[in-house]
Amino acid sequence: EKPLYPLEHQQKIDQIDDWISHKYLPSLFRGAIDGPFDRNFIKTSWRLAALVNAQTPLPFYIRFIWPFGLRRARFINDMSQHIDFSLSIKDMHMQLFMELLEHIGDGPFMGELEKPTMLDFAVFPQLVFGYMFGLEEQLSAAKHPTIKAWLARVSEHLPENPLLASDKMQVNSLKEALSN
């Protein structure tokens, strides 16, 4: 049995889960809230629309206006209540990256736990999605040796495509990125 929420680590897991829910995950939407509305944002938005369309067909006009819709999406704007806008996007990402390193600590898994928990499975997909599905050319999270090693350890407990996106839309292999 592999419990995702072992009760003997309940306090530690709850503390890190609060960080994930109220800081880490909302930060992923920062660029859609107040990032530059430039060619890269539009390209990334259209790729996201294509990924959604592969699972649930969308009319062309919805895919076309996707970049504008992201800026106005209620769930994204609701997330903004948890974001510290006093930091630049770059500084916020650096701060969260350092906090992620602290939460992994000496590992092998988040919270310095011996087995992966819901914490690892909540953060892992966020770090690999962009690379696996063509939103970024390199697995940027794997540039740091601690994160790369953690990603490799977590990936051993997951299928080849651990994400909720169509296999046919996957453009990069996680295994390949982690073996370099």
Show which residues each predicted segment covers:
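A non-catalytic, amphipathic alpha-helix used as a structural packing/dimerization or gating element
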Residues: K12-Q15, W19, S88-Q95, E99, ...
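Acidic, serine/threonine/proline-rich low-complexity intrinsically disordered regions
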Residues: L135-H144
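Acyltransferase donor/substrate-recognition loop-hinge adjacent to the catalytic core
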Residues: R47-I83
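A mid-sequence, solvent-exposed acidic-amphipathic segment
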Residues: F68-G111
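GST superfamily/GST-like fold recognition
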Residues: L113-M132
